[in-house]
Amino acid sequence: LPSLIHFAACAPATGRAMEIAMSSQREIRLNAFDMNCVGHQSPGLWAHPRDRSWQYKDLEYWVDLARLLERGKFDGLFIADVLGIYDVLNGSGDAAIRQATQVPVNDPLALITPMALVTEHLGFGLTASLSFEHPYPFARRLSTLDHLTKGRVGWNIVTSYLESGARNIGQQTQTDHDTRYDYADEYLQVIYKLLEGSWEDGAVLRDRERRIFSDPRKIHPINHQGQFFSVPGIHLCEPSPQRTPVLYQAGASSRGKQFAAGHAECVFVAAPSKVLLKKTVADIRRRAAEAGRDPHSILIFNLQTVIVGDTDREAQAKWQEYKQYVSYEGALALLSGWTGIDFGQYQPDQVLKYLHTNAIQSAVEAFSTADPNRQWTVQALADWAGIGGFGPLVVGSAQTVADELQSWVEETDVDGFNLAYAVTHETF
């Protein structure tokens, strides 16, 4: 694996990232969390008069956001993605379509290059599912982005969970949860061989006098033959600044955490409480140690939504204003897709019990076990997830928010946060 790399660094940052992670004076890492769609994880808030997410298809929207985040010293922009539609609610995608619940959604890859052009330090975390593209062409995409961003790109590795996505690439049903991670393990082995092993250092000569650009003796076919992939050839790209981009992993099931312990440099989780987050962080670090890694070589980010005002009262008023725009139907469409549970079959006051599904098992566990004393109803769940998704919400003045984020770091050992928005770009 490549060494730990800090997204925001403008110089080689391996030592600095490790130093910060291990020091007593910890730096809180902040990523903005967005998606190439309307509203992302705040269904209905696209109708708010100050929201710009409906402009997602305009390049100016993304360039403005990149400049804002660079000015605000964010470490990176974490770009989510989904290839499929949320069609579990009432067995139809109609609710998602009506409420613009992550549909329409454009490809995230094309956003990165123009945003990199107007920034110097901002990192970019690209979500790309390894379920829908062969590793050979995808390795070329990663190298290309790493070249064009001068080493500021990361890859959020997801295995995909929507049945609709599987059906639209010719599969009758989604592959079993754990089998997808077995597939992912081999996928990563192919990626490593292509990015790290195919081209030696010094293979690119650019020798004008001898008219030799690259030395074929230093470029090697990977000759991979495995259960899922056969890749005999060389990587098509010369080595990029990082070779392998920063690797994110965003699943918190037991198998997902095992995968993260072996591969990830950064892990994205969505724990709604400090108790659950502390347990999750400790589990990930324990698994990393068992895999022979320094437990703190993995940076762990929790989903968080912040609503800030000049005073606590102003922030609370802003939150109350935002809640008027939340779409209950859109929230249920998200929740149904995330968990595989059709919440349309329940009344709003229906109390839910723990349910095992094949879709985002960690999300099901989160709302079922986060607060054992709370009776979770469909309405309560929709209210909770309606602004920012499954993560906790922090509302208050700048001082209140800073103190609260610091307390999460100190009490849970988390390294930072992926900050979702209620209204964009206002939230950021």
Feature locations, PLM:
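Leucine-biased recognition of intrinsically disordered, low-complexity hydrophobic segments
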Residues: 1-4
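N-terminal glycine-rich cofactor-binding segment that shapes the pocket for flavin-like pterin cofactors
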Residues: 15-428
